Amino acid sequence: MNDSLVIRGIEFKSRLWVGTGKYKSFEETARAIEASGTDVVTVAVRRVNIIDRSKENLLDYIDPKKYKILPNTAGCYTVEDALRYARLAREAGVSDMVKLEVIGDEKTLFPDVCGLLKATEILAKEGFIVFPYTNDDPITAKRLVDAGAAAVMPLGAPIGSGLGIRNPYNIKIILETVNIPVIVDAGVGTASDVSIAMELGCDAVLVNTAIAGAKDPIMMAEALKHACIAGRLAYRAGRIPKKLYASASSPIEGMLT
């Protein structure tokens, strides 16, 4: 059965999305992307020269026929910077999609919610397909929907922390609050974190540091691929209710007396 994710008419076959920062080399990045089974790759516009392609570039290692390139505005601390880099990526023909980041604090890398809402509204009106990186607040998520976001990307934990999904209850409330896809972004540390996000009902998970920072990034990428598939299947299958007391799994009818 086809279980692709469709956002604004764009089909995403993989629910594991992969970032491209912190790898040892472009070659390792390409191998990890391949092992992950993803078809969505995020690229920081600030760190990739999308104008001058005469020099070695990450985009030389990513086949645009095989992967959807999702430019992101990582490292932007103002609305103006975020708008500039989003527009630059589109003008260069990379994509109409943008993973929008407006960072509010250098130490925690938490988003500037006010700036994020403003930038989302502006870019959505300009025809961008906006995927804003946000906190795990359901009210903020709802306001991003109103601002024109195509999906919301709440953090599981601070970027690069590897702490996992620290507040699954808020993520669950976001899922119940918004009528657009929810993609967990940031904080994933290992395969079980991906599985938890998918079991909660999230539509996808974006991972970077958990792969790039692993002892064996290629092996971890493959592990996360399987965790994403398993978590999604478990969500669709429907887990049993949690109970305080035991319930025998073997029937008592026909027992010898």
Curated annotation (Swiss-Prot):
Active site residues of this protein: K99
Pfam families in alphabetical order: ThiG (PF05690)
EC numbers for this chain: 2.8.1.10
Catalytic activity: [ThiS sulfur-carrier protein]-C-terminal-Gly-aminoethanethioate + 2-iminoacetate + 1-deoxy-D-xylulose 5-phosphate = [ThiS sulfur-carrier protein]-C-terminal Gly-Gly + 2-[(2R,5Z)-2-carboxy-4-methylthiazol-5(2H)-ylidene]ethyl phosphate + 2 H2O + H(+)
Subunit and partners: Homotetramer. Forms heterodimers with either ThiH or ThiS.
Domain of life: Bacteria
Keyword Cell inner membrane: no
Pathway membership, UniProt: Cofactor biosynthesis; thiamine diphosphate biosynthesis
Organism this protein belongs to: Thermodesulfovibrio yellowstonii (strain ATCC 51303 / DSM 11347 / YP87)
Location within or outside the cell: Cytoplasm
Gene Ontology MF: a single term: thiazole synthase activity
Record-linked HAMAP family: ThiG
Protein name: Thiazole synthase
PANTHER family hit by this protein: THIAZOLE SYNTHASE (PTHR34266:SF2)
Family matches, as CDD domains: ThiG (cd04728)
